[in-house]
Design a protein with these regions (language model features):
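Intrinsically disordered, low-complexity sequence elements enriched in Ser/Thr/Gly/Pro
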Residues: 1-2, 232
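Residue-level detector of solvent-exposed, low-hydrophobicity positions
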Residues: 13, 95, 100, 114, ...
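Primary recognition of N-terminal secretory signal peptides and signal-anchoring hydrophobic helices
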Residues: 2-7, 18-219
Length: 329
């Protein structure tokens, strides 16, 4: 009986051992599965962290891309500024033209405005004379600080308030520059905008423009009547002559006006033709023949040498005194 009981116990114990052996693999498999799951999760997390780092690097790269040569050039070039109130062929002029107002006249830098109108324009400065010379393929312009004119292709263009200087650059009226470049100039009063339209690039030369007969007589009468006067005094005499040419009560040519009886005593007996005008008188003649007008005598038809007993002094109103002459209208 005891043996039988012991045998049964052994069998039961063996059975229990067999059952335990079956559970161990299952537990091992479970543990391995859990560890594998954790490893996968860790691997996924690691991949995610790596991807985030890659994305961060990529994002930083997008913020600071490697500059191309073109980008570097653009970055290095200074910003170009424009004068929105001066339009050249519809486009704003560069701010370097330095537009200013002087006695109601718009002045600009001669060198900068020339460059804006013609890319080939080159400027040369002579500090000893205060003169700037601008050259293009078609045009040569010379302006000297303090002068009352600019010379363009041998033409003398009047500057009523004289050639100036601002911030180290020679300044002249915009109207003079546009005339020299054969450009048109218009002002829009509603917007305050100045419109410039390019033309041929250069005005006609002095040799082709000035009528030699007119220049002959005008330079001589200016010299004879006012050769010792300041430039505007000489021009004023020339203006009176041209005012008469334009007035129907006088002859319609310069020579005709001078030859009219009892008008210009310097003409009598051929004396005027035999005069040799000085340089200042020739310049004054060219200025008035090119449209230069001394504002105060724009309506004057007579002048005298401060003579209170002249016909004009007794019958006409004195408009202005310039130098040693009175002018009447």
């Amino acid at each position: 009986m005891k043996r039988k009981l012991f045998s049964m116990l052994l069998s039961a114990f063996a059975l229990l051992l067999l059952m335990g052996a079956a559970e161990v693999p299952e537990q091992a498999e479970l543990i391995l599965a859990q560890e594998e799951s954790v490893a996968v999760a860790d691997e996924q997390m690691l991949e995610t962290e790596i991807q985030l780092e890659v994305n961060d690097v990529s994002a930083e790269g997008e913020e600071m891309p490697e500059a191309t040569d073109e980008a570097r050039q653009i970055a290095e070039e200074p910003a170009v500024l424009f004068d929105e109130l001066v339009l050249i062929d519809g486009q704003p002029a560069p701010i370097e033209i330095g537009r200013i107002q002087n006695a109601g006249t718009t002045y600009v830098s001669l060198a900068a405005m020339a460059k804006a109108l013609d890319e080939s324009a080159a400027a040369a400065w002579d500090g000893s004379t205060g003169t700037v010379t601008v050259t293009t393929e078609k045009l040569t312009i010379t302006a000297r600080m303090g002068d009352y004119y600019v010379v363009a292709n041998g033409r003398y263009l009047y500057v009523a308030e004289h050639v100036g200087q601002n911030n180290g650059t020679i300044m002249v009226p915009l109207s003079v520059v546009t005339k020299a470049f054969d450009a048109t100039l218009n002002w829009d009063a509603a917007t305050g905008t100045i419109h410039v339209r390019r033309g041929s690039g250069a005005l006609m030369s002095g040799d082709a423009f000035y009528n030699q007969d007119d220049l002959f007589w005008m330079s001589r009468v200016i010299y004879a009547e006012s050769g010792n006067q300041p430039l505007e005094g000489r021009m004023a005499v020339g203006n009176v002559v041209l005012n008469r040419v334009a007035n129907p009560i006088f002859p319609n040519t310069i020579h005709g006006v001078l030859a009219q009886r009892n008008q210009f005593s310097t003409y009598k007996g051929g004396k005027l033709a035999n005069r040799t005008p000085n340089e200042g008188s020739i310049i004054a003649a060219k200025l008035v023949l090119d449209g230069g007008v001394v504002e105060e005598v724009k309506d004057a038809l007579w002048f005298d040498a401060m003579c209170s007993n002249s016909w004009a002094a007794r019958h006409k109103a004195c408009l202005v005194i310039i130098g040693g002459h009175k002018f009447y209208g």
